[in-house]
Every structure is written in C-alpha cells, then in structure tokens.
Curated annotation (Swiss-Prot):
Domain of life: Bacteria
Cell cycle as UniProt keyword: yes
A Pfam short name: Mur_ligase_M
Catalytic activity: UDP-N-acetyl-alpha-D-muramoyl-L-alanine + D-glutamate + ATP = UDP-N-acetyl-alpha-D-muramoyl-L-alanyl-D-glutamate + ADP + phosphate + H(+)
Protein's recorded name: UDP-N-acetylmuramoylalanine--D-glutamate ligase
Amino acid sequence: MENELFLQKQNFLVLGLAKSGYAAASILHEKGINVVVNDQKAFEENEPAQRLAERGIEVICGEHPTSLFDQHHITILIKNPGIPYENIMVEEAQRRGIPVWTEIELAYYITNAKFIGITGSNGKTTTTTLIYEMLKADSIKTLIAGNIGTVASEVAYHADGDEWIVTELSSFQLMGTHAFRPEIGLILNVFDAHLDYHHSRENYEKAKQNVYLHQLESDTAIVNQSDETVVRLAESGKAGTVPFSVHQELSSGAFIKDGMLMFGDEAILPVDDIVLPGAHNLENILAAVAAAKTAGASNKAIQKVLTSFTGVKHRLQYVTAIQNRKFYNDSKATNILATSKALSAFKAPVILLAGGLDRGNGFDDLKPYMDNVKAVLTFGQTAPKIEKLGNELGIQHVKRVDNVEQAVSAAFALSNEGDVILLSPACASWDQFKTFEERGDMFIDAVHMLK
C-alpha cells in the first residue's frame, strides 16, 4: 500500500520503447499514474509509440527534448537498460537529482510477490531457468522474468502475493535500482564485463551489489564462496547467507562431496546423474540448488530437474550431429570467460566459430583453453584479433569469413568424424545482429542446411 501511494504521487518519464519501456508506460497508464514517453525513433516508423498514443499516452519521438522535465514536472525517469548514462535525458535527470530507474525497480514497487534475483557475469540464464524448473516441479507457485526475455514489470503486475518471481538481472538493469529487494538474492560470479558501459570494474561491481544491498535480516543472500568479489559484495547487506562452492566442501549450503551433490548434510544426487553438459554448469547447478532449497523445493523435485534438464537455447545447446560431427550453439557466450568454459566442456577436437562486436579487449585469456581447437573460423569486428590469436597458437586452419553461415560451411568442410563444431563467439553480437538469439538461430539454420 505504501509503495502504491508513492507511485501515485509521481510524474514519470519513460525513456526508450523497447519491451521494457513499452511495458512500464502501459502499466503506469493503466494505474492512472502520470507518464510521458520519449523515444529516439521517428513516430511514423515506431509501432510501439503509435500503440501507446492510441491509448492516450503522450509520446515524443525523434528527439530528446530536455524541456519535458519542466513541462511535465518529471519526478522519476525510467530508462531502457541499454541506454547509456551519457544520454542527454539521463544526464539532465541526474543533474536535477531525479532518480533514474530501470523497470526492475518499477516491478518491485507494483507487486507483493516475492523475488528471487539472479545476477552474475556468466550463467544467469541457466541458473534462473533451473531455479524456476525446480520450484515448478514441486508445484510451488512460480513465475520467471527479467533479462531472460519476459519483462519483469509485466510479470509483477499480474503476480499474486504468494508467488515467487524468479528474475534474471543484468548489471544494466541493476544499475537502475534503488530499493529493489529480492527475498532471495544471488550473485553467481563477477568478472570484468560490460566495462564499456560501466567505465570501471568498481561501477560494475556496485551494480551487481544491488542484489544484496537492500535485503533485510529475514532475507537470504546466496553466495559463491569461491568468488572473493561475491563474498565481499554480500557483506554489504543484512541478509543471512547460504553459500555454494564447486571447489570446496562446506559445512552448510550446496557443494560436492565424494561425487555427491550435497545441501548441508543432505545428499541430493550423484553428480554423474546430472545430464546438463559442461563442468562449468556445476557452479550454476549448485547455486540453483541453494536458492531452490531456500525457497522450499524438495530434494525429489531437484532430482527430477537435474536428471532431465539438458540446457537452455543458445547456452552450449546441442543442435544435431551430421556425419558424426556434433554441432553446439553457444551464441550466449558474449565474453571470453563464457567461451573458455565452453571449450573446457569438450575433450574431442573442436572447430571454433568466434567473433563479433569489438569492445577493445584482447583474446589472450583464451589461450589456455585452446589445446583441443583444430581450426578457427572468425567473423565480425574482432575477426583480425581472433585470427591473430589462432596464428600465434599455430592452429593449422585459421580463416576469416564474412558471417556465421559462411563459418558453418567452412567448418564442416574442414571437419572429420568425431569433431565438435562450436559456435562460441566470445563477443557480443551487435556488430552484425540485433541479439545473440538472432546469431544463434542463424547458426542453427545454417547447420540444418548441411543435411
């Protein structure tokens, strides 16, 4: 009730009309709260803007007029997570001391449902999906939302108070939270990522820290005991902690002991019974078990999921085998760490397809994981850098191609029986694609064209 009264007193400016902006504007309007929308794309070409305008919402397109702040007495700006803080409207809001939200903050304000918030540099989507499936397998009322594709505010708006909203959270989304408080907060790991957006490791960590920062003593922080940064960030909050570790046996929480997945003194199941491929996924699984057990899931439900769940699309996804060559789609590998983990998952010879948006980093950190790589097909802005890496390692076949389709054809031509052909770009997709999903789908389509 207190949150509702707060919202009713505000005048909102929604900046950016991707899915999250459209949902935020729609919800605020439906609740009778003052809202105006601003989007860079021209109105004539902007279908979401046209739909909002038809409902009586004021939409200003094609420019970013700072006069809107005075004209509409704006008190809160909600921005699309991808819009940089250097945007003129964001800078104007900050200059005026106006809070800058993402729609995750709005989601928190409009529901009485409970949140499980999952973030980290890698593994978020897999872990989020695992937690959701584990709770669902136990008939616990559960919804899934956030960076995984379903807009959190939309889910929260229709959620009941006794439901869990399992929410994948990016650093972009978390940077725009100020009071958001998940009853269960989880940081999987923290590595250098998105420094072009956050400008420093410190800012990136601060964004991630928001998962823990506003928790109460009655809440739970799920903590990767093997990640010093996560342990340090967890100390900022008041919540009790439940640890997990893939590297050490613990007295509580989730860990591996004598080949068994444990939660405290409970043996959940043998690690060999888990069907999700890749040693790196054990960390995601342990985190998911810690969160699911905290939320009330039974061992039986967890066992059911872990003996049947084979992965999420675009995350080390097995596509098919053609002439005894196995194809894997790991398009979600948008950084070096994700690709190194993918390479570590295979003992067979690998033909690596990599490349994409150039964020200014090098690729030397991949070198320790390239022993099984017999060929590299590279594309996108980073192709020269990855080509150089392959040549430095003395890999026999290193070839630059124009796109993913050409990479698939060239990889198949170079392959032998028993090889793995792996799309794991180690780069964001935005130089050639709108999303990593689009890139992964192109890979899958190109693979099926080989049949």
